[in-house]
Design a protein with these regions (language model features):
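Catalytic machinery of carbohydrate-active enzymes
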Residues: 1-367
Length: 367
């Protein structure tokens, strides 16, 4: 196909991804979705995600994203998530399922957002043939460029061209493929709006605070075994929040999954003891395990400040435009959101934490 980017006006774009089903990993693609909608306001965006297993909570959450017309999740592995080895499904079986999911969906442009391997490259090439669609992808190595009609430079070349450090910021990664279309990020933020469930929860559960108090949502998170190293040490976190309360009293709401309820309760006990030493008693409500991801947007969206570890609710709060302070246990530049209304701190002490939190509270919402 010889259509140039200036002549393009695709009615339906398919975005192919196969990296991770984590909340933050998928939500950070929303900046690229925004950029595509800015270029072609009337285009309909469709996500095709090749995931390792089915049933992730993020499936329903991403399907409800306001920038997507549809989202399709196709598993590429067999067996249970806990197995040491999970065999891959035969390629023909995966492709047949993809074709079935998309059989009634017109597609004009297919963008392979992945840079590694050949799985998504070959699938994009094949889908382009059966849908008679333009194909866009990343020439991470020479063989991949043969699968596309329009080719973006490799990730390292893209980074060098823009003077970006490696590894590339996670939000920036989808823009590597978009470079083939002449679409640049230009500071585009990730974005999220509460879907119907989130709006309903917010209407049914208005968060209240006393006179002169702020509403703070704390997500300690990192409850899975692989994420525990990212969880803040509870005594240090308590010390920072007590120091903040001394400067700006707040009502505190704890978020988290059901399996994070135990750590929330441990934190709550430590905080209560520390506050009592000053004669204070903060209101603390624990919502762990009680909210869907869509309902969680109704909680986060009411906060004056969200404090979170490096986990999904951190990216959700940023995307909602809520002032957000993220606590990192180690320097992780690809996970930062270098923009107004967001502060990333690495092992902060009370003084640094309080100064950053007060700055965010003063600046207010970024939507």
């Amino acid at each position: 196909m010889n259509t140039t980017t200036s002549e393009m006006n695709p009615a339906n774009i398919l975005l192919v991804k196969a990296h991770s089903m984590g909340i933050g990993d998928l939500l950070r693609s929303s900046a690229a979705w925004s950029a595509l909608k800015a270029r072609w306001p009337d285009t309909r965006l469709h996500l095709l995600m090749l995931s390792k297993q089915s049933g992730y909570a993020t499936e329903a959450f991403i399907r409800s994203h306001h920038l997507l017309a549809s989202a399709h999740f196709v598993t590429v592995k067999t067996g249970d998530p806990g197995q040491d080895r999970q065999p891959s499904r035969p390629r023909a079986q995966v492709w047949a399922e993809v074709a079935q999911r998309l059989k009634d969906q017109p597609i004009d442009l297919i963008i392979d957002c992945e840079s590694g391997g050949m799985r998504t490259a070959l699938l994009t090439w094949w889908l382009g043939r059966i849908k008679r669609a333009q194909r866009v992808g990343i020439a991470q190595f020479p063989m991949r460029r043969l699968c596309y009609d329009l080719v973006a430079p490799s990730g390292p070349r893209y980074a060098a061209r823009l003077g970006l450090p490696l590894p590339i910021d996670y939000t920036e990664r989808d823009f590597v493929a978009l470079a083939a279309l002449g679409i640049a990020r230009n500071g585009t933020r990730i974005t999220l709006k509460s879907a119907a469930a989130g709006q309903a929860w917010r209407n049914d559960h208005p968060l209240l605070a006393g006179a002169g108090q702020s509403i703070v949502v704390l997500n300690i998170g990192c409850g899975t075994e692989d994420a525990i190293p990212k969880r803040p040490e509870l005594p240090k976190l308590v010390a920072c929040l007590v120091a903040l309360y001394a400067q700006q009293p707040f009502a505190l709401h704890l978020s988290g999954a059901e399996f994070e309820r135990e750590v929330n309760q441990a934190f709550r006990g430590l905080l209560s003891t520390a506050m009592a030493q000053h004669g204070w008693q903060a209101e603390v409500l624990d919502w762990a395990g009680q909210l869907s991801l869509d309902e969680l947007t109704g909680l986060l969206g009411q906060a004056d400040l969200v404090v979170s570890s490096d986990s999904g609710p951190y990216h959700m709060a940023v995307a909602l435009g809520v002032p957000t302070l993220c606590w990192f246990n180690f320097d992780t530049p690809p996970s930062y959101h270098p923009q107004r209304g967001v502060v990333a701190l690495v092992l902060p002490g009370p003084d640094q934490f309080v100064a950053s939190a007060l700055g965010l509270l003063t600046a207010g919402c970024q939507t």
